[in-house]
Structure formats: structure tokens, C-alpha cells
Amino acid sequence: MMRRTAPIFSVATVKNLIDGKFTESKATKFYDVINPATGSVIAKCPQSTPEEMRAAVENSAAAQVAWRNTSVGNRVRVMLKYQQLIRENSKQIAEILTEEQGKTLGDAEGDLFRGLEVVEHTCSMGTLIMGETVENVSAHMDTYSYRQPLGVTAGICPFNFPAMIPLWMFPVAITAGNAMLLKPSEKVPLTSMKLAELALQAGVPAGIVNVIHGGHDAVNFICDAPEIRAISFVGGNAAGEYIHARGTKNGKRVQANLGAKNHGVIMPDADKDHALNSLIGSSIGACGQRCMALSTAVFVGDAKKWIPELAERASKLRPGPGNKNSDFGPMITKEARDRAIRLITESEKLGAKVLVDGRNVTVPEHPNGNWIGASVVTDVTTEMPCYKEEIFGPALVVLTVDTLDDAINMINKNPYGNGTSIFTSSGIAARKFQHDVDAGQVGINVPIPVPLPYFSFTGSRASIRGDINFYGKQGVQFYTQVKTISSNWNPKFKNTGATVNMPILGKDQ
């Protein structure tokens, strides 16, 4: 059991969720769930057995038959109750999230709230799932289409957003009439288990959300199981490319959000305070472990004179435990911390300057935490490791260019295309940037342009695999299939014999 002033959730051994029951796994192999701020083991996460995974997917397939025939209104009512329960338990969920992932409580609450917004949007499913109709495509004939659920779907979640990403996935999938087999990150399974527990309390039927655990074997099972029709994945490039290739080979839909290298372009006419504060907050916040972190600053022309002030402001941020008054928490693992340090050090050897150096930062009260401080690295070129690779840590890489065209060309040559931002007071510059830049999400004086769920998360190029994006209208499209019906209610069919020619619709007959 985790030690708390008040118990939140039993986490001695994380359980599977199958058929509405939290059951102990018969696994013989377990992952340690480690508090990254203290280095202490707070739970054991099983590698679900093949028999447990098969039982989970078969149960989901059986349960989905009745669920798909439940009216969309009743499915929405379950989501209305669910969003209420999330709100009522938000403090508790944030505390669980902070303990297993390391985020500050404020950031954990934001993580949860951005997922809650997706749950709220699913409460409009009756409108989102509407089909189309054309009357009189031919005499007495109508054609109409509607969206039907796929069946069993799967979600494979990352460590960096333990609440938001699962809530991108299963609420949309199940409100559209599917079942979902969820696999949380083995590093942060506790938040997902709490969200699943609340889903059952809200009235989600047994089997409609099942949860298994594991690593490579669990991923392979999801990619190969014939019952699973679609896979939603968020995580790194290697895993995402693998899941997309293996899943699509087996005939499944796959949407995979992968790595990123998001650039923030600073024009000389930008509001200096807003631009610098935005760069620092979006690159250092969450210890830089966001797929939409603005990790790369591109100063255009005379804006480069602000770089020393940028460094001064960044140097004031301090890491620490998420439940204290810290600016940001630790890295998720020691390996992730060491990798970030390596990329900075290798680039320094190639000529980069480390104006703010967080590589040797310590937090005395928690010496075993995965600590790294804020870093600002300047004089960077596009050939350096800190630019070519995603650091995924609290480091801001700084480059300078002469013109906006130079900045756009740099961004477009980078293989990633998750998001980008420009800071300017010129509508002309902003319009040119949004039109010419090749990125899925563009911010204008907005540092992290992740859209609200009325729209969809729209990465591009090497940052996305699959052609249907997350949440919003596209999320509904991903979890449904279109059926088109042509009906003929002619009051008096003519007995003209069998017609062997291709029928021509659209003519009065």
C-alpha cells in the first residue's frame, strides 16, 4: 500500500479490469511503478498473461453486442454522469497522477481537465454521429448513410499524460457504441485505473472498458487480436511506427501520434514579455515531457537581443516534488534524464553554449529523484543532436535566423510536424506563417496550440501515422464506419423482367 494521510486507491499490485471486475493478475513478471520524485516503488504493475488478455478481448466483444444497441441518448447519459464523477474526484485523481508521474499538482489538474473537456464533448454524440440523407436520388428512391460503431477498439497510452490521453480515447470510442481494451503505460497505470473505476460507477457496462497491462507482448496482442478493429496510440516514434505497421498489416485502423520538434518563432515586433514567458513555460513546464512542448526557439532578426533575458528568466525556475510549491517535477526515469543530459553535452562539444545549465541540479530532500533543471542552449545549428533529436526534457534549444522565410524553411525541413507557434504583432507575418508552415497545429501568440475538442488534434508528417486524427469530429470518424442505404419504395413496381445493364440512378423512372 502507498503511504498517505488519507487512502486514495489500493495500489499494492495493480489489477486487471475484465468484465467489470478488478482482479489480481496471475502474472509472474511485474514492473515497478516508481515515484520519480523520490525513487520509491509505489506499486507493482503486472505483465498481464496471454490468457488474461484473451479473456479481456473476448469479454469486450461479447459486451459490445448489447452496448451498440443501447440508444445514443442512454450512452450520452452515462457520459454526463461520468464527467460529473471526474469533477467530484478531480483532486484525488490529480494526487494519484502527481505521485506516479511527478507533475506538479497544478499541472496534473490541467492534464485531467483537458481530458475532461473531451468527455464533455462526447455528450454531444447524438449530433456528432449524425449521418446524411438525400431524398429522391431517383424516382421513389432515397439514399442515406449513418455511422455505426466498429466493435472492439484498443487504446495504448503514454506516460506523460496519464489522464488526458486515456480520456482522448475510451470516452469517444464507447459513446460511439464501441468497447475499448485499454493498455495504460506500465510506468503510470494508477490514474487510468481510477478513471476506469469511475467509468463503472457512472454506469459503463461490464466489459465495455477493460484494462490490461504490459509491454511488448501486450502491444503485439493488441495488434494481432482479430476482434480489435482499431488502435489508438500516443507515444514515441519507434513504438508508434511499429504499432502502425503491425496493426495495419492485420487490417486494423491505426491512429498514432508520435514524436515532435516544435518550433517557436519570435519576431522582432512580438510582445517581448509574452513571447519570452510563453517560450519558458511551454518548454520547461511538465519537465519538458509534452509532445507539444515548444522545445525550439527561433529568434528572427533583432529579436535575438532578447536571448540573455530569456536565459535570466529561465534560470529562476526550480524543479521539486509535485505536491510542493515547485515550478516543475522530475523526469519520468533516470534513463530519460541521462538521455537529455547526453544530448545537451554532445551539442556543447560541437559548439553550442549552455547559458542556463540544469544538468547538475539536485533536490536535497529527495536525492533519489530523477532531477534535472531548466536549461537554455544557444548557438545551436540544425546538425546538432539537441536539435535533431527530441530531448523530451526541460531544455530550450535556441537558434537565430535573419528572416521569417528562413524560419519557415527551417521548420519545414525538420521531419516532425506536430505543432509550431509564431509570436508577432503583424497580421501579415502571422498569415504568411500559418499558410506556409508545414505543421499540423499552428499557434499565433499561443505557445501550446492544442485545440479544444470541438476540433481535432492534427499532427502531420513524421509526428503522425494514420489519416484520421484524435478526438473532435475526426475522433468520431475514427471509431465509426459509414453504412450507406439505398431504398426504393415505388408504390407500383413494373414487371419489365430482369435488368442486366448497370442500373442508372438519378433518372426519373
What are these regions (language model features)?
Residues T38-K44, V204, I228, V265, ...:
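Conserved C-terminal structural/oligomerization subdomain of aldehyde/semialdehyde dehydrogenase
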